Regions:
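PRPP-associated nucleotide enzymes
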Residues: 1-272
């Protein structure tokens, strides 16, 4: 299987270029012939409408060539807008899902989809999950780390049980929707309290993580604090995590954060 890597041309088996017309419109152009006997894997991130447009152009080329191909979306624009918020707002995920689903791929893989709605709106879609305890054993490889889920949604995502998992509940202001306080649940099952790892799918500005981190630091002042998220979508959040946690694990689904970490001198950031 050959890869068409829309994130990095250097890592693409199939070479291409992206032209831009005077009006700003982009056009994807293959610079070598497609082998119709070969299967293809398209790697991409969709953080904006232009990246989605480029992907659809790639799909058009592959479908007209009649080749078998699979799609791997590392970050999917609109996946947080997975419901109708009001009649005055669009159902963004449904719109994006329809555009992707019309392509002729065999299977679509999405890194840590925000909710099951992604699989319902995109044809033949599978979410690629990273589970906490497997991650600790295979990547971190340190003893005495206790997993903390930042909210009930994260707890449910990773199939934890309320009775024996550490997690936070958020108390919100009914009128404003702002978070008033965080409540740490199941403190009685804390084992050694030497190291805690927050685990979630996404970080925006990071306010929830920082508020909960402050509580745990007061409770366990000698402990180390790690965090693992799949998607960091905001440089403010990236800075907040790297400046406050002892170690930050994240993918480069949204942006090449490893390069940013080097530029800013964050030696506690790990791409995973």
């Amino acid at each position: 299987m050959k890869t068409i890597n829309l994130i990095s041309l250097d890592n693409s088996d199939v070479k291409y270029r992206i032209d831009r017309f005077p009006d700003g419109e982009v056009q994807f152009v293959l610079t070598e012939e497609i082998d119709r006997k070969e299967e293809y894997n398209v790697e991409c991130r969709i953080t904006n409408a232009e990246q989605l447009f480029i992907l659809i152009q790639v799909g058009d080329i592959l479908d007209r060539q009649g080749v078998v191909w699979v799609l791997h979306i590392h970050y999917l624009m609109g996946m947080r807008m997975d419901r109708v918020m009001s009649f005055e707002r669009p159902f963004t995920l449904k719109i994006v899902g329809k555009m992707i689903s019309q392509m002729g791929y065999e299977k679509c893989y999405v890194d840590t989809a925000h909710s099951i709605r992604t699989m319902l709106e995109i044809r033949e879609c599978v979410s690629l999950e990273t589970y906490p305890y497997k991650f600790l054993m295979e990547v971190v490889k340190e003893p005495d780390i206790e997993v903390v889920y930042p909210d009930h949604g994260a707890l449910e995502r990773y199939e934890g049980e309320e009775g024996d998992e550490l997690y936070f509940e958020k108390e919100r202001d009914i009128e404003t929707g702002n978070i008033k306080s965080f409540i740490f649940k199941n403190e009685d099952v804390v084992n050694k309290g030497k190291c805690f790892m927050f685990f979630d799918d996404l970080c925006d500005a990071g306010g929830t993580f920082l508020g909960e981190l402050e509580i745990l630091k007061k409770m366990y002042p000698e402990a180390k604090f790690y965090i693992r998220v799949t998607h960091i979508v905001n440089e403010v959040g990236f800075d907040n995590l790297c400046k406050n946690f002892d170690r930050v694990y994240a993918t480069e689904s949204y942006r090449d954060w490893g390069k940013v970490a080097k530029e800013k001198g964050y030696d506690n950031f790990v791409v995973c």
